[in-house]
């Protein structure tokens, strides 16, 4: 299984994703520049956090037009795993790969802390090694992390079990339904505001994010070989 970590101008969590996959999990992973036009040979795509294109217009609004994005959409349409954390989640919504939008935090402040989450759906490519309703703690660091969608979309997300992670105990940004992460109908595209890649080593004090990547590698390998 070969994984691409897309690098946009202003990305700053691409190294974190790469190290979590390569160094910690031993995965076959490459950095791929946003100006590339092919993802041939890759079995999964990761969109990192950061401030792509300086967050001008809106977070993720310009990145959706990057030359690499048609290939990201192609892999998603083919059922291959596509993952976005923080700014990557924002890009996925702007690109139409996930429903809804991320708006400014209700506090109007940048929030940076570790926050409790509930694993709502453990039947996805990315969460199969968690227990349903398991409580975990992951770092967040964002100013535009408040998930918004109209009521019909929210109802559909809930009915189809597309809410994958939910904020537990407190809502740090005003996200509707306490949503921290969602997937598409097929379950192969996941976006989340928390940063699992920052919680993969005991030396950092937290390994709650490690199973996102172990789940991806376990299930993605089956998809790639199938």
Curated annotation (Swiss-Prot):
SMART domains: GATase_5. GO terms for cellular component: cytoplasm. Part of the FGAM synthase complex composed of 1 PurL, 1 PurQ and 2 PurS subunits. It catalyses: N(2)-formyl-N(1)-(5-phospho-beta-D-ribosyl)glycinamide + L-glutamine + ATP + H2O = 2-formamido-N(1)-(5-O-phospho-beta-D-ribosyl)acetamidine + L-glutamate + ADP + phosphate + H(+); L-glutamine + H2O = L-glutamate + NH4(+). The keyword Hydrolase applies. InterPro entries: Class_I_gatase-like, PRibForGlyAmidine_synth_PurQ. Keywords: ATP-binding, Cytoplasm, Glutamine amidotransferase, Hydrolase, Ligase, Nucleotide-binding, Purine biosynthesis. The keyword Membrane does not apply. Part of the phosphoribosylformylglycinamidine synthase complex involved in the purines biosynthetic pathway. Catalyzes the ATP-dependent conversion of formylglycinamide ribonucleotide (FGAR) and glutamine to yield formylglycinamidine ribonucleotide (FGAM) and glutamate. The FGAM synthase complex is composed of three subunits. PurQ produces an ammonia molecule by converting glutamine to glutamate. PurL transfers the ammonia molecule to FGAR to form FGAM in an ATP-dependent manner. Its main location: cytoplasm. This is Phosphoribosylformylglycinamidine synthase subunit PurQ. NCBIfam families: FGAM_synth_I, PRK03619.1. It is found in: Cytoplasm. One of its GO terms (molecular function) is phosphoribosylformylglycinamidine synthase activity. The gene is purQ. Pathway: Purine metabolism; IMP biosynthesis via de novo pathway; 5-amino-1-(5-phospho-D-ribosyl)imidazole from N(2)-formyl-N(1)-(5-phospho-D-ribosyl)glycinamide: step 1/2. GO terms for biological process: 'de novo' IMP biosynthetic process. Residues 2-226 form the Glutamine amidotransferase type-1 domain. Its EC number is 6.3.5.3, 3.5.1.2.
């Amino acid at each position: 299984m070969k994984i691409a970590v897309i690098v946009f101008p202003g990305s700053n969590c691409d190294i974190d994703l790469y190290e979590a996959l390569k160094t910690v999990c031993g995965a076959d992973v490459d950095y791929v520049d946003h100006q590339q036009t092919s993802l041939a040979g890759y079995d999964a795509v990761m969109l990192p956090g950061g401030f792509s294109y300086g967050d001008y217009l809106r977070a993720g609004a310009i990145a959706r037009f990057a030359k690499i994005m048609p290939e990201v959409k192609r892999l998603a349409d083919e059922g291959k795993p596509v993952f976005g954390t923080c700014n990557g989640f924002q890009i996925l919504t702007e690109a139409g790969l996930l429903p809804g939008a991320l708006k400014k935090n209700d506090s109007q402040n940048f929030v940076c802390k570790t926050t409790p989450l509930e694993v709502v759906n453990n039947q996805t490519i990315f969460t199969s090694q968690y227990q349903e309703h398991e409580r975990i703690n992951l770092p967040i660091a964002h100013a535009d992390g408040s998930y918004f969608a109209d009521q019909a979309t929210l109802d559909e997300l809930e009915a189809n079990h597309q809410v994958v992670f939910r904020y537990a105990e407190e809502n740090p940004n005003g996200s509707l339904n306490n949503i921290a992460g969602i997937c598409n109908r097929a379950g192969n595209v996941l976006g989340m505001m928390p940063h699992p890649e920052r919680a993969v080593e005991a030396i950092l004090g937290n390994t709650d994010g490690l199973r996102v990547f172990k789940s991806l590698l376990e299930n993605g390998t089956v998809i790639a070989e199938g």
